[in-house]
Curated annotation (Swiss-Prot):
Domain Phosducin: 1-241
Subunit relationships: Interacts with CRX. Forms a complex with the beta and gamma subunits of the GTP-binding protein, transducin.
BP GO terms, sorted: regulation of G protein-coupled receptor signaling pathway; visual perception
Superkingdom, taxonomy of origin: Eukaryota
Modified residues (Phosphoserine): 73
Bias kind Acidic residues: ranges: 1-14
Positions of the UniProt region annotated as Thioredoxin fold: 111-245
Annotated source species: Canis lupus familiaris (Dog)
Signal sequence, start to end: none
Protein name from the UniProt record: Phosducin
Cellular component aspect of the GO annotation: cytosol; nucleus; photoreceptor inner segment; photoreceptor outer segment
Record lineage: Eukaryota, Metazoa, Chordata, Craniata, Vertebrata
Basic and acidic residues bias locations: 58-68
Length: 245
């Protein structure tokens, strides 16, 4: 009698499950077996196993998936963070390459500021002992002479812009030949290279407007080809971009 009842229940269940997929049929059958079993005759451990089998998508699986998703998110974050570190390393590498390139192309000594010459001997020593590839621009000035202060200020800017050029200044009274450099011919520019005087300009401020700046002096010297090609400040631009980020 019991056997006939079970057979009838299974036939009824199979009839209801004919429109589900294979996995759905199996899960429904497991659920049905759990419900049709006598609860008093099934051990608790077996009922738990049957329950888990009838519900494959249980909470533990969901928790595992959530943990996996969180783990993947962390991995993605680490990848993004690593990409950013790689980008920073690439920038540092490029900057180092640019520095190396500048050093190779800009061979020779570098200065970057204006040298104050105190005596005639120091003036001669600077001209004679400097490397032959170095251009030396000397401003002979005197305090109180019109245009001398402005030219000294222009030299400060140009020395920073053209570090391969040695910019110097000396008072006319300290040259040992003050009678040759009276206030009438000041300010005077003397340009040397390889120990030789290659150009000179007396009363040079007459070439400028009443008020002039470093750019005016730069243009004037460039007209005579006395300055090298100005260095491209790519490294400074790169640093600014990194600071911005």
């Amino acid at each position: 009698m019991e056997e006939a009842k079970n057979q009838s229940l299974e036939e009824d269940f199979e009839g209801q499950a004919t429109h589900t997929g294979p996995k759905g049929v199996i899960n429904d059958w497991r659920k049905f077996k759990l419900e049709s079993e006598d609860s008093d005759s099934v051990p608790p451990s077996k009922k738990e196993i049957l329950r888990q089998m009838s519900s494959p998508q249980n909470r533990d699986d969901k928790d595992s998936k959530e943990r996996f998703s969180r783990k993947m998110s962390i991995q993605e974050y680490e990848l993004i963070h690593r990409d950013k570190e790689d980008e920073n390393c690439l920038r540092k590498y490029r900057r180092q390459c640019m520095q190396d390139m500048h050093q190779k192309l800009s061979f020779g000594p570098r200065y970057g500021f204006v040298y104050e010459l105190e005596t005639g001997e120091q003036f001669l020593e600077t001209i004679e002992k400097e490397q032959k590839i170095t251009t030396i621009v000397v401003h002979i000035y005197e305090d109180g002479v019109k245009g001398c202060d402005a030219l000294n200020s222009s030299f400060t800017c140009l020395a920073a812009e053209y570090p391969m050029v040695k910019f110097c200044k000396i008072k006319a009274s300290n040259t040992g030949a003050g009678d040759r450099f009276s206030s009438d011919v000041l300010p005077t520019l003397l340009i040397y290279k390889g120990g030789e005087l290659i150009s000179n300009f007396i009363s040079v401020t007459e070439q400028f407007a009443e008020e002039f700046f470093a750019g005016d002096v730069e243009s004037f010297l460039n007209e005579y080809g006395l300055l090298p090609e100005r260095e491209i400040h790519a490294l400074d631009q790169t640093n600014m971009e990194e600071d911005t980020e």
